[in-house]
Amino acid sequence: MTTMMTDSGTASDSGAGLVDSTRNDTTTTTTTTTTPGDNDADDDNTNGTTTGHHDNNETDNNSKSYSSTHHVPAIDNTSTTNANDNEDAAGFLDRDQSPLSSISSPLSEPDNFEFDTEPIPSILSPKSTTSDNHARDGETPELDEDGQPPAKRRRVRETTPHNHSRKPKPESPPWKKFEAEGPTTIITEDGRRKSGRVNPVLLGMKPSDKKVTRKAIQTSPVSNKSSASTSRKPAPASSSNSKHAPAKMPPPPPPPKAPARKSATTHETRPSASRSRRRSPSPRRPATPPKPAAVGTRRSTRQALAHSRASYDDGQLSPGASRATPRIKLKVRPPLTVIPLVHPNQANVRPKLGPTFEEYFARAHEIPVEEGGQHIPDEEPKYTDEMALQDAKVILRVEKEVEPGGLLAPDRCSAFEPEAEEEPPRQWAHLDHLTKAMTNFRKLMYREQQLHMQAAKRIAIACEAEWRRRNPQPKTAEEIELEEMEASKAKWRQVIRAFAGTWENVRVEVNRRRLVEWEAEEQRRVKAALNQAVNLSEQKLQQRQAQVDGDEITDEDEDEDDEDLASGMPSVMGDEKESDEHSDQGSDEMSDENDEDEDEDNMSSSEDDDKKSTASDEGLTQEELRAKYANLPTLGTTDETEETTKDVEMADAPAAMDGSVANDDDTSDESVDMDDDLGSSEESDDDEEEEEDDEEEEESDDEPAGLLGLFFGKSELKKLKEEAVTEEPSVEPAGDVEMTDASAALRPELQVNGHAHEAPITNGTHTNEQLASSQTEGADDEVSLLVIPNDEIAAENTQTAAEPGSGVVEKDFLTNDSSLKYPNEIVQSENQTLPAKESVEAGGDLPMVDAPSTDDLQRETAAAPSLEAPPNTRHDSQETVAATDMQSQSQTQSPKTTDTKPTDVDTPHSELAVSVQKPDSRQSSPQPTTPTVKTEIPFLLRGTLREYQHHGLDWLAGLYANNTNGILADEMGLGKTIQTIALLAHLACHHEVWGPHLVIVPTSVMLNWEMEFKKWCPGFKILTYYGNQEERKRKRQGWNNDDVWNVCITSYQMVLQDQQVFRRRRWHYMILDEAHNIKNFKSQRWQTLLGFNTQARLLLTGTPLQNNLTELWSLLYFLAPPENGEGGFVDLTEFHNWFARPESQILESGREQLDDEARAIIAKLHKVLRPYLLRRLKADVEKQMPAKYEHVEFCRLSKRQRELYDGFLSRADTRETLQSGNYMSIINCLMQLRKVCNHPDLFVDRPIMTSFRMSRSVPADYEWKEKFIRNRLLATKPMTTVNLSFLNMIPTEYEDLSKTHTDRIAQLSSHRILLDLREAQKVRANNAYTALDPSSVKSNLVYLESAARWGRFEELQHCVYINALRRQQRPIYGKRLTEFLTLDTHLRPYKPRPRVPAKIMSWFEEDSFLLHNAIPTLQQRAESMEMTITKFACVTPAVVTGPEMNRFLLGERGIQLFEDLDLKLSAPVKYAPYMPPQPPPDPWHEARMRLTIQFPDKRLLQYDCGKLQALDKLLRKLQAGGHRALIFTQMTKVLDILEQFLNIHGHKYLRLDGATKVEQRQILTDRFNHDPRILCFILSTRSGGLGINLTGADTVIFYDQDWNPAMDKQCQDRCHRIGQTRDVHIYRLVSEHTIEANILRKASQKQMLDDVVIQEGEFTTDYFNRLSVRDVLGSNGEVIASNEDDVAANLAMDRVLGGPSTTGAGGYDGTADGGGGASQPPVRNVGRVLEMAEDREDVDAAKAAEKEIMQDEADFGEAGSTRPGTPGDGLADLDGQLLGGEENKEVEDEVIEYNAWGERMHTIDEYMLGFMAKALEGTPLELPRDRKKGRDRNRNRKGKDSRKR
């Protein structure tokens, strides 16, 4: 179908699809004849004419329907163009084909063109309708049935065709039976598409005034070839683009000159097929116009086309169509992201590149497109004249070949050939089937032939061999030679194979040595990087100190610097005014000491202000800096005389004393750069020359910054380095300056005359501000670690604010220590103006100093007690410091872990002070202290906070004030929830921040958090977000309104389900309870929460370290994610490189055997954690906390358990599995062993025993013989005996009948009636008798009817006989007489019931109940024997047979008697008048069932398990002592067994697991705490760690061991927490000599790791029964096994779970490629593997119980701390293996031989090793595969062994 579009539509297409997006009012004129049902499609066409592309399918369908109903003369796509326009366009195209036309015509931006919005009237029709379906003025628009304007079509005729009368159809072709009279497709009103062949066209679907005539359909001319080919394609809506323009249209009159505006803004359609556009399927959304072609962008082309089109438009206007149509203006709202231009100056006008177009195009090809030119690097070179000529030649040649006779002529070119019609597939005929069968049969015959030939060959060879065997012949020379050749070849292959194997071994050995060298080099690199970072931070600190000492600071400079620093960094107290006042006060004091500072200028080695020299220090190494500043004097000495001497050139004694104090504070472990990099971000406003020097140093600052990357991004690091350079204007600082020992320098100076000098504290000649700055820049974490409380300090703090150097670096998480203002620990940064005496008296101890004596420490501690005194404090020796950093020469005061136990100073406590270690090994709780806390308790908080909770609030408030995230890691039970609520209340009261806050908690404690909020802070509006989808949707009403609620409490599952909702909201504080849920950074939970929009984050967890350091890193990175790709925490690889060594040593050999380097690294880790982690233990903060005792109860296996355990281990497949390397199979075996230990029913249930039922008994085989004998020998002939009963000749046969009954039968006799019926039937049968005539069907039917009548007669005759026989049955005496005369002797000794009713009452009175009790009935006897039968009828017969055995034992009569008796006993009895009769109970049912089915005894549940036996004794003891217990287990099935156990013993209990509803958990918890009658509460270990308070119990019983000790620790804290008044006893049930002892050992090793890294001596009040554990574990930590099978199981467990037996010093298993041992799974993934090894139903139950905190445990798998094995003497061992043990000794004794060149002669092995090493030089070394990546790739390989073979 081809259509005619208006010039507007043509213009839209000719303009390369570029239209104004704000205008959509272009009008079109359409034909008045429309296809019925095309209204919807036409609306789409009209609405989307100029703005979009129409859908291909819609266009195609519309075109088809239009073609089928409108037979109008075919008009080509360019029919809208008149002849004049064609001539103009042709002339223009000729001009455009010149070579330089494409270059000379300027380009223009397509977006700048606009089209005239005035509609262009139709060319041919006097009427036209607008695009909005409104008629013109004076016309009434016609509406269709829907009330919409009719569809619009272009008219193709001047007049409407007449409605001719119907003409006969043309004759149909012979291959067609009928032809469609109307449209083949009808679109109904509801938009459905129907076929027009079977559905008539309704009149209502046609327009009212436009009728489709049949003549219009029939008079359609045949389209030409091109139009036909075009009609098959989807016709575009604006089909004005065509290659050929027909000349059928008469040329219009010459048009007048068009207006300039119209000629400038309208365009003519280019005759290019690529420029045509398709309409969008949606008319409302204008589609983006397609990118115009390169030629179409030339402005000259568009102008020419616009001019020609405008001429054509003006010429086509008629008077009737010249009226203007209403203009529609669509206002499009600009996007919100675009700032509107309100002034011309806001527009970014691009400067002109040339005054004229010629100059522009001369330069445009060199200027990039982005800058306004035409140069595109990726495009082809400039279009030159030669290229244009070449293209023109190609075009001319194509035109020439198109002519007749050319290659492209229609008669020669294959492109013009019609497409071949697809032939229909030919149906299979008989010949086809026959051919297929023949082919198949041929294949089978050929295959059979081949098999026969092969068999014949084999038989021939076998015959030949057999013939030679039977007829041996002497071998010929050729045969002998052939055999020798084969033997030689075999030997050669063997030698080559052995030789290749030897070289392969050599290659493996060389690679092993290379790997060892690489590992050593890698360790050196890591250590060097660590030391370099430490040295760099220390050098920066020393440079700043030396620079401050030698710099002359004027009052103005000092004031300006202080003001800039104070204004540039946030104040600690949040008061900018106080900060400014304190800065001014400090600057005045500094100006008073300028004379002293001038005396220190000789500290500098040069007096000039060479900034380049100072800046160049950043790029120098440590050795170069030492050489450069070797002549600098030290800042302090180690004794009192050196401090006061004049050689140091100090100003005065107070200054020297202050220097010692500052040195004491600044000295630190030089190997620790974690906090050295926490320097302040001081800003100085130096001159521009210093800024230029900073820019020169930027290149050197881009290198890696070591541990600085832990805390700062690249931009912050660069800024810090620039500031460090600008702070050194004239002084060249010293490289390594000897730091003064505090114990030698501070104390004597402080104790002069019993009091300290009343002088300000200075650092050498440092002033107070300089001291604060240097301390902030330094790396020491004493500021964040120690608290020196005093009322004077508190008073002073109210007047002073942070020093300029104590600011925070923007919003970085891990900022400097002084910026993390913990309670009362802002000593150096806020109290620098305090005199020395006040400082000492206030603080007692200066932070982290080497105490000279215990008395001094006690005296200082007594002067001002600290917040928390750690129970054990010990400092390392000088050797430890030397081992940490060999280059450091100064003694450090960084805390170390001692040989026996680490000090609590190393723990990440934020508020600690040094105390004295008590001689007792058992440490008690510290003495109460009264420190000063600055953060007030918010008035919104109801209740009273404990002292340590108030300090926690102060710490949290300090974190928020410094824009820092943190971890509140208090031990379970210390009230982390209350402290969090207090923090939110503090934000509301003091910062006026009410929210919104997001609190994410486990599902089980959601309601608990809501109750705590309502109890402690009822002023908050709480939204508990949970429920189904509809409930959550209802709760989200008013979600973005801050006044609806303040705190949203939800669970981890809800966050994952509705993460999009939570992401869109900006949260002020996001708090995660039980934060170990996000310990896996690969889990969906971690990644989802990481992307939330939050201002601050807080993590609450009682176990910050559960398994390894990867989990700790996940928490740290979650708190400090990088912003815009910069900053954030260090990556995981670097973090593991720092701290992998101590972790592996702890897991291998325990905490006591750590080397000095590992201890130093542990100290560094503590310093990393201190700034943002608060960890308090119950023993440290609670003065009246009850003690906690831990016991291990070893349970002997029961007999059944031992049999199952040993039997499983002794299996061949079990041994093979334990020795294999497939860890899934090993874990499966270990899980089965654990099930046996927990209860044997978990491993295999006690069966319900039944007897074996034989299908046939043994005597049944003789049944046929017995029947044969009876039939043969005992057979009776019927004719020889007379049946008297049949003859009715036995008088007493009917005595069971009553005479009355027989008389009544005789009275009601119907004998006569039956006789009459018989006779009548006989007559009918005789009359209808017919002989059999099978000749016809009719005769057969007549015979069948006759036979039926005779059959009826015989039936009636039999009835007459039976009736007469029964009528004659009469008794002699009758039933009543016999019953009356019968004595009930079977009822004796009971008196029979009288038959006279009058005597029944006397019979009841005479009945004796004693007689009834003496002689019980059968039912009473069965009830009395029920207990005996139940207890002792427990042995079922081995075999039972069928019922045929009874017939041989009892006979037929016996069986009949038993059956009759059974029927009588089971007859229903009516017990009550209105109750239906019921059968009596079977007395033999219980005995029959007991002897048929043997159910296991309930008592065996306890006696089959050693743990339950021990638990029974333990519960009895607890119940007698008034204790209550919590019983924890891992497996859900064990909970079921415990329920049965408690039910058997009658104990009251409650059960809680993951399947318990959220609403019920709090109810169960409250019920247990308030009901002392409940003895036990059985829980799952997973549900035990969900923040549930069960202080009503004082005993915790672990039924089985969890491989993760953190889970057990959480379970203990359910009852050992605040509110517990009694001592807590913990019992662990461990099966002795089993795998559980090894699990206990592994848990102890992980606990050691937690003690060293996090706790540092956590169990101070836990009196663990270590002797019992040592009895099992042995002296070396190995489990004492009872037999070889136990040893194999323990070794397999070590291989799988990781242990000393399988990991070397490095952690990789002993081989280089890991093939020698099991593919070790991650330690944290073992729990998941154990779940996979369990039964399916157990796994489902465990998932339901652990869904709150273990939902994504499969993702939580992380690799344990593993490192490559230490080579040791592996090389020598391998040499010994190659040479042999004895031969090696002989080689050592031999004399060394030399060759002719005087070189030592080596062995072949050495030669091979050297040769291979030389050959492998430069080749890539295969490094050990990363276990984590390997697990990720092989995660889908469930249980497959993926090791290298």
Curated annotation (Swiss-Prot):
Bias (Gly residues) ranges: 1704-1718
EC primary class: hydrolase
Domain Helicase C-terminal, residue spans: 1510-1660
Keywords (A to Z) from UniProt: Activator, ATP-binding, Chromatin regulator, DNA-binding, Helicase, Hydrolase, Nucleotide-binding, Nucleus, Transcription, Transcription regulation
Residues of the Helicase ATP-binding domain: 957-1122
Extent of Basic and acidic residues compositional bias: 168-180, 574-585, 898-909
Domain HSA: 418-493
Compartment annotation: Nucleus
Biased composition regions of type Basic residues, renumbered to the chain: 1826-1845
Any one GO biological process: chromatin remodeling
Catalytic activity: ATP + H2O = ADP + phosphate + H(+)
MF GO annotations: ATP binding; ATP hydrolysis activity; DNA binding; helicase activity; histone binding
Intervals of motif DEAH box: 1073-1076
Pfam family for this entry, one: SNF2-rel_dom
Disulphide bonds in the chain: none
Binding-site list for ATP: D970, E971, M972, G973, L974, G975, K976, T977
Extent of Low complexity compositional bias: 24-38, 98-108, 888-897, 1769-1781
GO cellular component, one term: Swr1 complex
Cross-referenced SMART domains: DEXDc, HELICc
Main location: nucleus
Comp. bias intervals (Acidic residues): 549-565, 586-608, 663-704
Comp. bias intervals (Polar residues): 1-13, 63-84, 216-243, 762-777, 815-834, 922-933
Family from the record: Belongs to the SNF2/RAD54 helicase family. SWR1 subfamily.
General function of this protein: Catalytic component of the SWR1 complex which mediates the ATP-dependent exchange of histone H2A for the H2A variant H2A.Z leading to transcriptional regulation of selected genes by chromatin remodeling.
Name of the molecule in the record: Helicase swr-1
Organism expressing this protein natively: Neurospora crassa (strain ATCC 24698 / 74-OR23-1A / CBS 708.71 / DSM 1257 / FGSC 987)
Encoding gene (name): crf1-1
